[in-house]
Amino acid sequence: MSAVLTPAGFTDYKVADISLADWGRKELIIAESEMPALMGLRRKYAASQPLKGAKILGCIHMTIQTGVLIETLTALGAEVRWSSCNIFSTQDQAAAAIAAAGIPVFAWKGETEEEYEWCIEQTILKDGKPWDANMVLDDGGDLTEILHKKYPQMLERIHGITEETTTGVHRLLDMLKAGTLKVPAINVNDAVTKSKNDNKYGCRHSLNDAIKRGTDHLLSGKQALVIGYGDVGKGSAQSLRQEGMIVKVSEIDPICAMQACMDGFELVSPYKNGINDGTESSVDAALLGKIDLIVTTTGNVNVCDAGMLKALKKRAVVCNIGHFDNEIDTAFMRKNWAWEEVKPQVHKIHRTGAGQFDPTNDDYLILLAEGRLVNLGNATGHPSRIMDGSFANQVLAQIFLFEQKFADLPAEKKAERLTVEVLPKKLDEEVALEMVKGFGGVVTQLTKQQAEYIGVTVEGPFKPDTYRY
């Protein structure tokens, strides 16, 4: 391997091992060939430089695919400072490649909670002082929250936030409702080319991959329980069914529950008659005692609670692909049960009490990624072709908000512009078209007569905002 050199004097980064940069660069080049929409935007806007002057704070999983996103943003004129939004999700070779390119990045796999917050702070601060950032790109809302709580003065310069995930969007909407959100935001998560690709098809690909890498288990013929049947749950249930698992689904939303039934999954509840009264007696121990694998997909809290964890079959695999580690009651497990590390991001959780444990005891659970995102903790996340749509949306959303120049508006006009909106459908269709071209697909064009008949233009948008894809 050749020696890795960062630009002369460049020290504005912290990664696990800068010598991994050559490996990371090789993977970045391969990823570029699998991200036609993102690379198409890079070519389309290279001359016009729509992000010239943009200074973007980024907090999203520091993967190879994110490296392609970062270099697309900089190719279109932006400066960026980057950290990961998850302590386990960084691919160290990706972070090294970005640092070697002279881009400030603070991320490594296996950060502590304190290191995670330190990394975010290092993106916010440059030479010990708040950077004059004017855009935010977030995943989960931690960066947004820190800016609002600790650095509110920085918000006066920021034009907008683009948010990647369901959890982050929920936090933005809560802030908007409470009147604490100070800048407008684009909900990237609910763009069709994000939610259907990343949340559904991405999880279909990466969930079983992560479980197999983490456990080396054969999944076929075993029983799985998927908690939640939104887009992430749908992809997860398909992922396990592909492996030959007997998949059951739990849901709180009657519409999603109906979809699970229509898709051929048995709809069950981990609670007797579907009612959780807070007691262990309400847990359906007979059901959970047969479950070999449980995965949470909701973005909600304690959807796999202490009572459920106690009732699960011995040696069951427990994992989360929703967002934060509080979907599973890991706090209860840390307090009451003994943890034995098998390898990084794989633990035996001995249910015989805290402290010491008998290594020959078979009453344990296998917890993956400490209850954090399993597909990024135990594997490499979604493939490049999936993240292509999500990250193309991020680029277009950054351009859209940067051009609106919210921070430059007079105070009396800012209030009406404080919104959390989905990316305009025309831009969603632009991303989809580039993705289709990447597959070698050909989209049929409407004739003028056909367009007039259904009340659209030949160029689109082709569906009303109320259309459910």
Curated annotation (Swiss-Prot):
Q: Which UniProt keywords apply?
A: Cytoplasm, Hydrolase, NAD, One-carbon metabolism
Main location per UniProt? cytoplasm
Q: How does the cofactor attach, per the note? A: Binds 1 NAD(+) per subunit.
**Biological pathway:** Amino-acid biosynthesis; L-homocysteine biosynthesis; L-homocysteine from S-adenosyl-L-homocysteine: step 1/1
Q: Where in the cell is it found?
A: Cytoplasm
Give, as one word, the top-level EC class.
hydrolase
The protein's required cofactors: NAD(+)
Q: Does the keyword Lipid metabolism apply?
A: no
User: Gene3D superfamilies in the record, alphabetically?
Assistant: Adenosylhomocysteinase-like, NAD(P)-binding Rossmann-like Domain
Q: What does this protein do?
A: May play a key role in the regulation of the intracellular concentration of adenosylhomocysteine.
Protein name per Swiss-Prot or TrEMBL: Adenosylhomocysteinase
Name its species: Ectopseudomonas mendocina (strain ymp) (Pseudomonas mendocina)
* Gene that encodes it: ahcY
